[in-house]
Structure formats: C-alpha cells, structure tokens
C-alpha cells in the first residue's frame, strides 16, 4: 500500500535527475513571472543567446509596480513604465502569454493564476516572488525563487532543489464567527514561530481545513512562508475540483474526468509518515492582530501586548525593539490602538470572498473621520465580479476608495505608501519595518473584516462586536 505524502508524490513525479551533493533537478510545470524579478533573467538569456525552453509553460502579468488610482500609460513613474515596457517586449520576443493591463486577466500573479485555472493539483509551480506558496492550496508544490533561478527556469524549465521535510499542521474543530483563514495562519505562526518551518513543507489538514473555501486555503498557504516554510499545501478534494471546473485553462470533457481521478490520487495517504505533526483547535482561535515587526508577533484582538518578562529569553530583544518601533507599551491592550490608514487587498487577501467579508462590515456604516481607507481588488476579474455584486458601491458609500488591481500597499514599489509615522491596519502579509513605504511607517496585520472594522472605528476593534450589530443582507445592491 502506498504510504506517501502529497509532497513525496509530486516531488517524485517531477524529479529529472539526482545531482551531486544530494540536490535534485526538478521539472517546473508552471512558471509565473512579473515585471520585477524577470528583466535581469531575460537579459542573461539574451547575453548567452538562449531561448526560453518552454514558453507555453510560462505566464506573465504586471502587478508590483502598477498604480491603483489611474493606470493610464505612460505611468508617471518612469522606472515603473520602463519595467512594464520591458516585460511587454520580453513576452512578445519569446512568445510568452502576458496578462496585461486591460486584458481582463491582469492582476496579482498569485490571484490570476488560480482564477484562470493555470494552477492545478500535482503541479510544481515556481515564481520570482516569496508568496508563491499560495498555489499549494490546490495540492501543488509551489515555491518562490530568486532572479538567478528565474533565469534557470526560463532556460531549462527545471531547478536544482533540496527535498524538504514535511510537517502536518492538523486543525480540529471549526473557526468561529468573525474568524477567518488569516487569523488561523497568524495564530499558527505566532505559536510555532517565524523560523519553525525552515527546511519544511507545511501540509494543512483536518476538519477545519476541509471546510475552508479555496480562497481561504490560498490565504493559509500564502503565509506559510512567513512561518519559515518553503511551501505550504492542502490536499486536493471536492472543494478544489469545484473551484477549477470551467476555468479557462482547466481540462474539459473526458480530460476533466481523467484529471479529477488523477488529482484525487495525489492526496497524502492515510498511513503517510510525516517528519513532524502539530495540532490546533480552530474553535479556540480569535481574530488576530500583529503588534510587532514580524508576522510571528501576533496576538488575539482581546489580548495585550506581551510583557517582556513573559517571553522566552531569545524573544525579548526583538520584542523590545518592536515595542519601541511601534510605539506600544508592553502589557497594553491591542484593541483601541488608533490607526491612520486601512488597506484591504494583496495576494493574501485581495480575492472576492475577502472583499465580501469586509463589505459586510462596511455596509451601512462609514469610515471614521481622518482615516484613509481603500480597497484594491487582486485582479481585473475580482474587480468586475465585485462590481457586479455591488461591493464597490458599498465601499464607496462607506467612505472607502475603490481602486484598480495591483499589489498596492503590500510593499513600497508603487505610489501607495505610508508617510512618516503613519500606522496601517492592513490585510497584507508582512509587517517589517518600512515594508509599506515610509522607513518609519508601522503595520498591523489582520483579516479584511478586521481592517474594515478598524476603518469604521478609527482604531483596532474586535470585528465580532460589529458583527453582532450587523443586520444580515442577501445582496450588496440593497
């Protein structure tokens, strides 16, 4: 009887050769590229006169540097315009599909590939972006790579990799009202630490994972990297197949039925052996907020910033540094901390279900005075779907700005930035110093619903308090 994990199965299927030193040459089934990490890679190919080995397995989009208020060309930022023009030229020269601005398919790379059906179970997926682990939600093995590796994949459609150990993260129970996948992964990272996953792939499993939507699973896998893991994944199941069916690049007809049968066989076997296992109880998890300068410095919204002496000795120096940087006092409640900017979007939480969760909180309310709040859909498809359901109107009426798709304030590569000592409530994935623009800017990570609650109240707020006062509505058009 087979006794392998999904990771073992996908690894073995893509192994090209065993290399000296213990690494493996691994075939890459899907290579996703964007405007930031691809120019140098293409330049290296041109210098050596090399073609792109498998242009049909390479798909490009533009996301990091695009402005979200107006995407009229040429961009005001000449460097951003040059980067996009270079990507357009490289894709045209090498025969690579580009999901460009206005194509109906543009967006954040980790949003568009799943929604187009490009990401499928059993694949190996590589991209020059840290959060490529997102695609593991489909039962793929997906990993971020550097620019030199982007070059290698373009040239050979393969990579030299070391096999990872596998840690299964089993989650029992069900998440409570107002608690989302973002809260679950922040809780996991808080509990295990930001370095616990080094050398591991994380398999997310258990009753709480089984009932998550694909978009929630993507949030979970997206932030596995923040816990130190190289990749995270969920075994493919009926939820996966229902999401993929009918998507542009998904198989059809008899090929679909064959694909589903094969995909089903990839799930980790009941007697699979894991290198490590940890368990969590979903019912015990509350809405989370980061208070510090790493994603591991998170607490439940009804908790307080930890006192220094309550921490392990190795955690104390960075906790002291974080409190100084964030202007927070050890022992103070996180709920009630004032915010300046509220950002809903990113490859972590810029999908339709994320926007719906935030809109449910915003509907019938208004952004607090002095708060800048804006919503950036993760893709053109997400934007159009949200607009069809009236979400843009809900947000605008509540005082939020409704923007064009892009990475936006997740990182400081476009005009959406914090200024000075501003503090943001953000649905993105990293709260490092200066991550969102200003070298002195501060970031509080939380779910989209929690960001919406902060925007309405002007401070960190337990979203469950607003949910209890929300009248259910079947339509955002009402």
Swiss-Prot record:
* Stored CDD domains: IPMI (cd01583)
Alphabetically, the GO molecular function entries are:
3-isopropylmalate dehydratase activity; 4 iron, 4 sulfur cluster binding; metal ion binding
| Gene3D superfamilies documented for this protein | Aconitase, domain 3 (3.30.499.10)
Q: Which domain of life is it from?
A: Bacteria
* Reactions that this protein is recorded to catalyse: (2R,3S)-3-isopropylmalate = (2S)-2-isopropylmalate
Q: Which organism is it from?
A: Prochlorococcus marinus (strain MIT 9303)
Q: In which pathway does it act?
A: Amino-acid biosynthesis; L-leucine biosynthesis; L-leucine from 3-methyl-2-oxobutanoate: step 2/4
GO BP terms, alphabetized: L-leucine biosynthetic process
UniProt-listed InterPro entries: 3-IsopropMal_deHydase_lsu, Acnase/IPM_dHydase_lsu_aba_1/3, Acoase/IPM_deHydtase_lsu_aba, Aconitase_4Fe-4S_BS, Aconitase_4Fe-4S_dom, IPM_dehydratase_rel_enz, IPMI_cat
Similarity comment text for this entry: Belongs to the aconitase/IPM isomerase family. LeuC type 1 subfamily.
* Textual note on the cofactor: Binds 1 [4Fe-4S] cluster per subunit.
Q: What does this protein do?
A: Catalyzes the isomerization between 2-isopropylmalate and 3-isopropylmalate, via the formation of 2-isopropylmaleate.
- Keywords in alphabetical order, please: 4Fe-4S, Amino-acid biosynthesis, Branched-chain amino acid biosynthesis, Iron, Iron-sulfur, Leucine biosynthesis, Lyase, Metal-binding
Q: What class of enzyme is it?
A: lyase
Q: How does it assemble?
A: Heterodimer of LeuC and LeuD.
Q: Which cofactor does it need?
A: [4Fe-4S] cluster
User: What's the EC number here?
Assistant: 4.2.1.33
Name it: 3-isopropylmalate dehydratase large subunit
> Where do the annotations place [4Fe-4S] cluster binding?
347, 407, 410
